[in-house]
Amino acid sequence: MRILKLTLLIAAMIMANLSQIAFADTKTEAFVKENADKVLALLDDDTIDASTRTEHFIGYMDEFTNIDRVAAFVIGKYSRRFSAEELATYRAAFRKYNLTAYELQFEEYRGSAIEITGSTDRSATDSIVDSVVRRQNGDSQDVRWRVLQRDGKYEVVDIALNFDGSLLWLAIEQRAQFLYLLDRTNGSADALINKLKELTDDLRED
């Protein structure tokens, strides 16, 4: 009888955990779907001008992502070595660069629709959401979203794109490039800030 009770208790605990995981997946998937739909709808809205679209886009991205968290991640140990002034200037430059890059990237998906295909919980507060972005011409792009939950709020901290079967996580790729530059320049915040400004200008000229 004791063994039976123990077995039932373990089974109940497993079922409870499974139901919590499924619930977390559903909420995280809905968060990605809802916000991606907002951005795609914004891109397709021909009733607003470019400056208004950019303003709305920035607002959506602030709801969708935590750019300051990503900014700290991509410079690793140097986030603790920069002075407060250097860190603030770097964050501003990183924010401007990332928002410009994301806006141009999303522009390529005008007329597209997103389909959520599943998700995986890495922990109770860390999930990967799988999706497919389908374009009007019939092409599709696999996109993965890493979503963290903090104090009941969801935020995207990285996006992965599938290029010819290889998965590229954008923040991880940025981290490798930024750390390479910082290591070569003895941790110069100015070198990284100037590089970000240069990259932003290049994006706007294209």
Regions found by a protein language model. Give the residues of each.
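Short beta-strand edge/turn micro-motifs at domain boundaries
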Residues: 140-176
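Non-transmembrane domains of secretory- and envelope-associated proteins
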Residues: 166-206
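Intrinsically disordered, low-complexity linear regions
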Residues: 26-27, 45, 59, 66, ...
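Early exported N-terminus immediately downstream of N-terminal targeting peptides
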Residues: 26-106
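Bacterial N-terminal signal peptides that target proteins for export
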Residues: 1-8
